[in-house]
Design a protein with these regions (language model features):
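Noncatalytic alpha-helical scaffold of FAD-dependent oxidoreductases
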Residues: 1-268
Length: 268
């Protein structure tokens, strides 16, 4: 189909409750709509050619009897940025859980307020402090993930459940016999770290901007809902535009074809 599978901020749909942010509170009951799986497995996939992921996506959506539960894409540059600039967030969530995040944000807010009384401290001092402290913590990412990042530009986390695990394993083994790239099946620890790394990657953009605010200019983010049948999903910018970009981070959801693309423009 040449229509998107998912829309973000589609103004045509922002009516009623959806168009009343800050005005209407909605309470709902969450119920299970699918049977709870007995087991799950995360597949970590890498390639240097986006066309390989295009073909894998098509094969899975068209031919698989069991569809994935999750499929998150991350470009190598985004992986690197998240590893460096979201490391402290990763560690806090891994050790203390997401429930601690409101407390952490409150601590950061108070530190930033106090730091304004000291002219020699940089703006958003809490970000500078947490970034500095994170350097003393050892590498938090599994070796196999690191090896894939070194070998491949494009990374894809796919979670399968129950019968879909064997179906995906057989498919990937066969596919990568004849195509560039590779995959591995994550251990439980690798699965948690892969998903958490992808989760905190969104924060790397803001952290980088806070630390480098003297060297960069404008920043902007785009959520792009691609048509279901779009094959050229990975953006390649013209040289004249690429040369003006200081940082760009690409990540997204390949199965529903939504890409999150963040850019920071060079000063001047």
């Amino acid at each position: 189909s040449n229509t998107p599978a998912r829309f973000n901020s589609d103004k045509r749909l922002l009516y009623g409750v959806s168009g009343s942010a800050g005005k209407v509170a909605v309470f709902a009951v969450r119920v299970n709509t699918y049977p709870k799986p007995n087991k799950s497995k995360v597949f970590y996939i890498g390639t240097n050619y986006p066309d390989n992921f295009t073909q894998i996506r098509k094969d899975i959506l068209v031919n698989f009897k069991n569809l994935p539960r999750l499929g998150d894409y991350m470009h190598k540059d985004c992986y690197e940025a998240a590893k460096k600039y979201s490391k402290d967030s990763f560690i806090v969530i891994e050790k203390l859980g997401t429930k601690f995040l409101p407390t952490l944000f409150e601590i950061k807010r108070k530190v930033d307020l106090l730091s304004k009384y000291f002219k020699f401290l940089p703006n958003k001092f809490s970000d500078h402090l947490m970034q500095f402290l994170s350097k003393f913590y050892p590498n938090h990412l599994p070796k196999r993930m690191e090896n894939f990042k070194d070998k491949y530009d494009h990374l894809w986390i796919i979670e399968m459940v129950d019968d879909g695990i064997e179906e995906a394993k057989v498919y990937f083994e066969q596919y990568f016999k004849n195509n560039e790239g590779d995959f591995f099946m994550c251990t439980e620890n690798e699965s948690k770290k892969a998903m958490l790394h992808r989760y905190v990657s969104a924060g790397a953009f803001g952290r980088y901007q806070s630390l480098k605010n003297k060297t960069n200019n404008e920043s902007f983010s785009m959520d792009i809902a691609l048509p279901r049948n779009e094959v050229n999903w990975f953006e390649n910018l013209p040289d004249e535009i690429e040369s003006s970009i200081e940082l760009k981070l690409y990540y997204g959801h390949l199965f529903c074809h939504v890409m999150h693309q963040n850019y920071i423009v060079k000063k001047g």
